[in-house]
């Protein structure tokens, strides 16, 4: 970037995950030795079985989906849990989910219709 052209263009190209990739959890390779500072129940200190595949499917109820959203108030993109989507900076719940735009618009239209307000159709 030079002083004559301070304009910087960045593009983020993301595609929605396929249904087979949504429940897939990748585990990083772990050390076979335990650290003295890690508790024995820590995932860092647990040993990885050589016969165990490195890709596992999660059946745990604690695993939540993540969504990539934009906050119109802070003008930033963040990746958040789908269960509790709030902007980490301003705590706003008004977020733009651009990967699932059609589902979000359908939910917004249904909520507006149930509250008695009219929505503008495109």
Swiss-Prot record:
Q: Motif span (EAR)?
A: 7-12
Outline the segment boundaries, as ranges, of region: Disordered: 1-62
Q: Principal localization?
A: nucleus
Q: Where in the cell is it found?
A: Nucleus
Q: What are the protein's UniProt keywords?
A: Nucleus, Repressor, Transcription, Transcription regulation
Describe, from its UniProt entry, the tissues in which this protein is expressed. Expressed in root and shoot meristems.
Describe what happens without this gene.
Answer: No visible phenotype under normal growth conditions, but the double mutant seedlings gir1 and gir2 exhibit excessive root hair formation.
Task: State its role.
Answer: Acts as a negative regulator of root hair development redundantly with GIR2. GIR1 and GIR2 may function as adapter proteins that associate with GL2 and participate in the control of root hair formation. GIR1 and GIR2 may function as adapter proteins that associate with TPL and participate in the repression of root gene expression.
Look up the further comments and give them.
Seedlings overexpressing GIR1 exhibit reduced root hair formation.
Protein name in UniProt: Protein GL2-INTERACTING REPRESSOR 1
